Amino acid sequence: MTEYSGIEVYPNTYEKEYCEEIIKHFNVMARNKVTYNQNNLEVNQDNRIVFDWAHTQSQYHYDYNLCDYFYKKLHDTYTEQYMEKYQMLKQSEQHSPKGMSIQKSLPHQGYHAWHAEAADIGSSSRVMNYMLYLNDVEDG
């Protein structure tokens, strides 16, 4: 029997070298404690770095090639695997990922605050959420 939980895992979708490049960019920004947004730099108070990587004309691209590769891989995995399993998504309105944040969580840490994935007008049309884990399983 096929399970339809909506939660899927696609191991090794992104190559190790690509993940290392994202970590390198994260570490540079974390060291400087800055977060880029569309119009300015902001001092970041936690361990989350927001890259406004949405693939649209009006938003800032921190590193175009890094972002473009991320969204191409995400799109390929989504259309070739996820949508094939969840056929109802083929009948939904056109949708695309918007923005990306990177957060470093040490072993036994995580995002434990209650939250909603469609909490405001900016996220109210969200169709799905995705996560890319950059650590090895042994790291926790």
Sequence positions of predicted segments:
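Fe(II)/2-oxoglutarate oxygenase catalytic core
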Residues: M1-G140
